[in-house]
């Protein structure tokens, strides 16, 4: 009987540990909504001020690695114009969560590929070009409950605006827009809600 005690103790400990892991693991699918600050620099953003906006995404988390896909939207004032510019489009974001020995707080690193368009308020101006945006950075997840995480993050990005045409509907005039590059810094504050069991 004495020889069985170490084995039985090990089994009990392993069962408790496994149960703890299940309690700590997030649901594999989650929805996230965030508010954004988008600071813009370079020729691709000439005339645009820093902007604010929002994003929504769905994320699949099978392990420490996860993949998200969603839609982002920011609004930017234009120098010497009454219109605002809207930068919007879809993105894919892989992420890797770093184990830091805590069940409450977890840092992560991330990358993001976005394909974006530019729109203008008022309906007079239109731009045929698209943005390609590549961002990298990281953040911190704070566990608020078994289903809800607070997400605070920031990324730095490379942006390329393709060739296109800027058209005024009221005058019928158009101006060619040459391909150009720029950079951006995005700060994000959001909530992620786990779905299912």
Where are these predicted regions, by residue range?
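Short glycine/proline- and aromatic-enriched beta-strand/turn motifs that initiate or cap beta-hairpins
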Residues: 23-67, 73-76, 182-197
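Outer-membrane beta-barrel translocator domains and adjoining extracellular loop/strand segments
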Residues: 43-50, 78-85, 118-127, 163-171
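Predominantly the C-terminal beta-signal and adjacent terminal strand-loop region
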Residues: 145-197
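Outer-membrane beta-barrel channels and translocator barrels
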Residues: 26, 61-65, 99-105, 143-147, ...
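Residues that define the transmembrane beta-barrel architecture of outer-membrane proteins
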Residues: 29, 48-54, 84-90, 105, ...
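Structural signature of outer-membrane beta-barrel domains
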Residues: 38-42, 74-78, 114-118, 157-163, ...
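Residues on the lipid-exposed face of transmembrane beta-strands in outer-membrane beta-barrel proteins
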Residues: 35-39, 54-60, 71, 92-96, ...
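Cleavable N-terminal export/targeting peptides
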Residues: 1-28, 196-197
